[in-house]
Amino acid sequence: MSSEPTNPSASREAAHNAPTEVQPPKGIGAMAGAMFLMATSAIGPGFLTQTSVFTVQMGAAFAFAIALSIIVDIAIQLNVWRVLAISGMRANELGNTVLPGLGWFLAILVFIGGMVFNIGNIAGSGLGLNAMLGIDARIGGLIASAIAIFIFLSKRAGVALDRIVAALGAIMILLMLYVAIVSQPPVGEALKNTVMPESVDFFVITTLIGGTVGGYITFAGAHRLIDSGLSGPENVNAITKTSVLGIIITGIMRVLLFLAVLGVVSTGVALSEDNTACLLYTS
């Protein structure tokens, strides 16, 4: 009667590692989190104001500017995300590799820009709560800031962020779709101007591009992929898909907002100077 020696620690290790091999959902969650983080970073108060004001200024011809900016946005973001995520290095790390000190200079610029943009985001969240609940915009900004701080203080902030931005992004698109349908915009005129615009303003196009992939916005999604471990040449297809889908989500939101505003202003309603976003939900 023979008995083979056993290694209890090896058995325990094998038993412990067996259930952890189911990784696809985590990868999918990281991809969704990255693209929605990028998209929701782009869709802020400036995004709403730009789209609303430019729609009033240009009318249906603004459709061409949106279409062209989406194409350019895809090219820019695809390039940035591939370089960063495939290398597995954040923008400042890669910059220091190319030229010592360049990464720190880039980080300072992004930090300054991020501070300015997030002051606007806090103000925008306050205006949003003011539009929904009628509370003072300053109190609304404090409430939104407290919620954000609570999320980032969590030990599972990364997982929470992936789920929260994906859920809120989907809700935001559905709400804007509803408003776009209810406002009954002249869709035929918008489609015609997409390929045959009545006027072209390259300043507007440049502004849209900067508001979508400028500053920290495009870095946010790429860095989220790196943080989640979705990097390296072997993940190039997932990186590419996530990059393009992030821009498409932003583009869908801009198109829906454009149609909603176009439908409202085509009836002769004037924009509110104090809270532009409130116009769509109160008209």
Predicted regions and their residues:
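Selective recognition of specific alpha-helical transmembrane segments in multi-pass small-molecule
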Residues: 64-79, 172, 240-266
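Hydrophobic transmembrane alpha-helices that form the core helical bundles
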Residues: 86, 103-134, 141-145
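Hydrophobic, small-residue-rich membrane helices and short re-entrant helix-turn-helix hairpins
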Residues: 50-55, 160, 217-252, 267-277
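Hydrophobic alpha-helical segments and their helix-loop junctions in multi-pass secondary transporters
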Residues: 169-195, 205-223, 260-262
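Juxtamembrane transmembrane-helix boundary signature
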Residues: 38, 65-98, 105-113
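Membrane-interface "cap" regions at the ends of multi-pass membrane proteins
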Residues: 1-47, 204-205, 231-245
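Transmembrane alpha-helical segments of multi-pass small-molecule transport proteins
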Residues: 35, 107-108, 131-154, 168-180
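Conserved small/polar residues in nucleotide/adenosyl-binding loops
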Residues: 281-282
